[in-house]
Amino acid sequence: VQDRHDAVVYLSRGDTVCFDRRTQPAASEVPVDYSALSVSRIVSFCREAPMESLARPAEAAVRNWALCEEGLQGRYGMQVGRTLMQGGAPLLGDGFAMEVIRVACAGVDARMAGAPLPAMSNSGSGNQGLTCTAPVVAAGRLLERPQDEIVRAVAVANLMTILVKTQSGPDEGRMSPACCAAFAAGGAACGIGFLRGDGADCLERVMQTVLGNVCGLICDGAKANCAAKVGMALHGALQA
């Protein structure tokens, strides 16, 4: 592995070299200019853009929701979502926030346990895509919002997540010691706020509050307990 965590340059099996790219210079990346991203521009775009330009968020809403439903129905991983659905109500309540949290946790349960369904990613991570998308879809359904409004809110959630990731630098955004569910949970909170009619100033404060709440969450590797971390991050996000 050279230069990047996903840049495999040498592979062998026994005495057989499958490929060797160690002598080749690393491909130079064209830097992406994120300076156009701001909270106000994100909100304006997602509110005014024609629906055909929001095809990706629309697909994310459908695909990630299907994965969450699979997680609620099957026995995947730690079954965080199913546990919250079946036994969380007496202690934690059974209202809006719990429904939003358990749906997202179920999606991560299913993904981390290898469910044969795709997840639409955010910033290269399926768990981040689930975390910033599924809660918004769940909230939109609970609030009985039309599908086009839910898609616009999903776009807000994903773009706000990307905005925060760009502030931590290219290397930190790609592989961070922090659990990036915190960033994505903030995006989800912004998407839900957008559904409620909150403006750009409010959404910026929401994101700042979320990051202040859960910024100390550390990544200890991708595995089943990611679902529990997503649940904790979303709990802090919904408080914001």
What do these predicted regions represent?
Residues 122, 136-142, 148, 152-153:
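Inter-domain interface/hinge segments
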Residues 95-114, 147-168, 207-216:
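Acidic-glycine-rich active-site phosphate/pyrophosphate-binding loop
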Residues 139-147, 163-232:
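Hydrophobic alpha-helical bundle architecture
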Residues 115-134, 179-183:
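Conserved phosphate/anionic-ligand binding catalytic regions in large, soluble enzymes, centered on
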Residues 1-114:
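Signature of multi-pass transmembrane helix bundles
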Residues 58, 94, 98, 129-130, ...:
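Conserved structured core elements
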Residues 128-136, 184-191, 234-239:
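Well-ordered alpha-helical segments within folded domains of soluble proteins
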